[in-house]
Amino acid sequence: MVLFGAGTWGGAITYFLNDIVWDYVVDNRRHAEFLNGYKISSLDEIEDKRACYYVVSVLFKWRQIEKQLKDMGIPSENILLLGKIAEEKQYFDLPYLKFGKDEVFIDAGGYNGDTAKRFIEVTNGMYDSIYILEPNKILATECREKVNERNCYVVEKGAWNESTKLAFDMADASSTILVSADEVIETISIDELLDGKRATYIKMDIEGAEYKALLGAEQTIRKYKPKLAISVYHNRCDIWEIPKLVLSYNSDYKLYFRTYSFTGNDTIMYAI
């Protein structure tokens, strides 16, 4: 069995789960010779790579490592991705989160369509409509290809408190609205997008723009009280300012917080 990743989380796994004996501990970039008594190797040092079972401890770049292993002929069933396990639970694992057959889902920060795809699976395809807001042109194209389903609309704009144009840093999963950056994008408020129509579930993971986007969803939230799943870890003040804002719109909300990584990143506030 191979532990892939000799960084912080690889160290935690070998230290706390010391009853597991690893045949290899590997890393693409070795910063030391040993990790808690294990020699840190490279993949080239493993003789029969395809016969091994790989546990990938890396949380943020697990997709690149998954591709690396698959390109080497490692079957998917031999790869356990800890980062993927944590990520797939986001937005849908809260036991109090219930879905009907006529959900209207707003996915602000759609990335490559993975969350919208998961929404379709969770609802067994029984929903009213899906709106994906993704200003990154490449990722918006991926969304259209991955979520080619009925009543699914990909809006190539960023969620904000108004319709305007803003500087944008194109960086795949961490694309961010900035004061100065390499691209200019169009933005839209959720209230304007829906134009008085209802939403039943709003998810936001937009790299620090959540507060502004919630300002632009005030009328929708006040009128329809949709379920919310909002990232509250991008800015230091988000963890208290975002709950205050949501409760100012509707004090009947009950708030729940879940963290989907070992680092405190991927902390989501649910409002139901």
Predicted regions and their residues:
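Phosphate/nucleotide-binding beta-alpha loop and adjacent structural elements of enzyme active sites
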Residues: 1-20, 28-272
